[in-house]
């Protein structure tokens, strides 16, 4: 089955940071009226297996200009890539998985059906909104969901599946988490909100985590309060971050501080990871030709051993990375 994206007209305010204000759903509005004790919120607070920042927030942060507080207007990839990040995040949190059908191996990883297996809230508004949409739908393929969440469909019966104002909502979430701040700036006679970086140490720690995989011979992750050592799938998360940043055309910003040779080898390693992890089972027996992060395969295998019963969840990750590997053809 060929992999195609179909475009429909979207309003300019749907995606640009600083666009039109968010229209909250009734459910989201209701979240502002909190009861004294919510067992589900208590469970979320006690859960140390998830990082403070989602994969989508990390990718957006890598693309933002630190002082200006907005993304490059020329970046056409990031909106679509962020929808893939949503699917990866839901899969790593155990909410969705590939439908367990023996016939699925006949199809490309991106063309395999996915289903909701845990409909409980994550505490992240965008993830929960996507999860609600998926719960109310028949199983669709990974690339179908990326198209629908992006509004890239000719099926007008499913146009309401589009997640709107994703970049602006992610930026506001980072403001709430103390990573960004909001400033009003003038663009062509209009005042619009921008979100400069408030906590540079957070962004720098994410960059260091990426570079720890793309530069040295051996991986050694550095942990922070926002990304503690207790996080589940910390190596797979970092690989997904690198591949998502590559697909979103923001990886270059991370590698720009390196000299030419290291930058070139870093890109080569990122592309090597994209090929290796866009199939399932992951190609952990593949020789690492770049000679970078040579211990990564072993570390990932140890993660898989510590998390049995997650194969169908991780197959979603592989399917999204497969879409990223074809981004140049899609756009």
Swiss-Prot record:
Any Gene Ontology CC annotation: Golgi cisterna membrane
Record bears the keyword Transit peptide: no
Gene Ontology molecular function, alphabetical: enzyme binding; phosphatidylinositol-4-phosphate binding
Residue ranges of the region described as Beta-hairpin required for oligomerization: 183-194
Main location class: Golgi
Assembly and binders: Homotetramer.
Family: Belongs to the GOLPH3/VPS74 family.
Top-level division of the source organism's lineage: Eukaryota
Natural source organism: Eremothecium gossypii (strain ATCC 10895 / CBS 109.51 / FGSC 9923 / NRRL Y-1056)
Pfam families: GPP34
Protein encoded by which gene: VPS74
Name of the protein described by the UniProt record: Vacuolar protein sorting-associated protein 74
Membrane topology annotation: Peripheral membrane protein
Localization (cell): Golgi apparatus, Golgi stack membrane
Purpose: Phosphatidylinositol-4-phosphate-binding protein that links Golgi membranes to the cytoskeleton and may participate in the tensile force required for vesicle budding from the Golgi. Thereby, may play a role in Golgi membrane trafficking and could indirectly give its flattened shape to the Golgi apparatus. May also bind to the coatomer to regulate Golgi membrane trafficking. May play a role in anterograde transport from the Golgi to the plasma membrane and regulate secretion.
Keywords of the record: Golgi apparatus, Lipid-binding, Membrane, Protein transport, Transport
Positions annotated to bind a 1,2-diacyl-sn-glycero-3-phospho-(1D-myo-inositol 4-phosphate): 83, 164, 167
């Amino acid at each position: 089955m060929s992999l195609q994206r179909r475009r429909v007209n979207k309003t300019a305010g749907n995606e640009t940071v600083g666009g039109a204000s968010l229209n909250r759903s009734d459910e989201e509005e209701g979240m502002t009226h909190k009861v004294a004790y919510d067992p589900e919120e208590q469970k979320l607070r006690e859960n140390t297996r998830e990082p403070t920042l989602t994969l989508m927030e990390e990718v957006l942060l890598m693309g933002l200009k630190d002082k200006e507080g907005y993304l490059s207007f020329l970046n056409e990839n990031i909106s679509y890539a962020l929808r893939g990040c949503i699917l990866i995040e839901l899969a790593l949190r155990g909410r969705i998985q590939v439908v367990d059908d023996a016939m699925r191996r006949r199809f490309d990883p991106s063309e395999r059906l996915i289903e909701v297996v845990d409909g409980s809230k994550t505490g992240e508004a965008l993830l929960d909104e996507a999860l609600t949409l998926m719960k109310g739908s028949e199983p669709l393929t990974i690339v179908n969901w990326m198209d629908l969440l992006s509004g890239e469909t000719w099926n007008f019966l499913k146009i309401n599946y589009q997640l709107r104002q994703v970049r602006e909502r992610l930026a506001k979430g980072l403001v709430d988490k103390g990573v960004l701040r909001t400033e009003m700036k003038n663009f062509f006679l209009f005042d619009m909100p921008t979100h400069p970086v408030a906590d540079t140490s957070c962004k720098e720690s994410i960059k260091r985590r990426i570079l720890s995989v793309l530069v040295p011979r051996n991986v050694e992750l550095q942990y922070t309060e926002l990304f503690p050592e207790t996080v589940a799938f910390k190596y797979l998360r970092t690989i997904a971050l690198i591949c998502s940043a590559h697909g979103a055309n923001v990886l270059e910003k991370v590698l720009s501080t390196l000299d030419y040779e290291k930058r070139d080898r870093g890109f080569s390693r990122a592309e090597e990871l994209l090929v290796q992890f866009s199939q399932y089972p992951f190609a952990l027996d593949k020789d690492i030709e770049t000679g970078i992060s040579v211990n990564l395969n072993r570390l990932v295998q140890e993660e898989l051993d510590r998390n049995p019963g997650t194969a169908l969840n991780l197959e979603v990750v592989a399917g999204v990375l497969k879409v990223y590997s074809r981004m140049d053809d899609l756009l």
